[in-house]
Amino acid sequence: QLGDLQTVVVYRDRIASVRADAAPGDDAVVVDGEGGTLLPGLTDMHSHVSDWDMPLYLAGGVTSVRDLGNDNGMLQDLVTRTESGATMGPRATLSGFLEGRSPYSAKFGFVVGDLPAALEKVRWYADHGYRGIKIYSSMTPDWVKPVAAEAHRLGLHVSGHVPAFMTAERAVRDGYDEIDHMNQVLLSFVLTEGEDTRTPLRFTAVGERMSKLDLGSEPVQRFVALL
């Protein structure tokens, strides 16, 4: 059930108040809502934006997006154009894609072959206005802890897939603030040693084996307690 008609006061880029008795000032711009329904802006917390979908976000009521990995040149150009008003689109919070080098490497962001290069790219992201990094599946597990430590030193959020041959528990202990995708958590409890999550197994193993997982088992409960 909808409430009574209200007046929404916007000051600069923020909603200042929602009241039934707000009187507009002499210099206020008044937009007649004509008895319609107003929703707060929605946020897409896991996106990979592109030129064509930015206006569609606004059309769907999404006013903020969190981009979790993209082509860095394209993304920076798109955000610059959006913030200047040259392109319509939501506000974007950026996390930089960081991948290890392997035959399975994803091709966006930075693909690194050693730890010094990984740390250098973390610093690049911090210097270019990114709010976090997203670690991907081919990252060497032993690099995660120093990479996360450097990211945190620079005030960056750390998220990502769980690298192949690493458990979700170790990823959290080594510095992850967030694991992207629920399958990346569940794989730790249904895989056998040596199985490679850089393959379609990261999808099929969860679908085929989850029904046999005991959620009360010690590994699952230990992980829940860790969180």
Spans of model-derived segments:
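Histidine-rich, glycine-flanked metal-binding segment
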Residues: 2-39
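Divalent-metal coordination cores built from histidine and acidic residues
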Residues: 33-39, 49, 53-170, 174-227
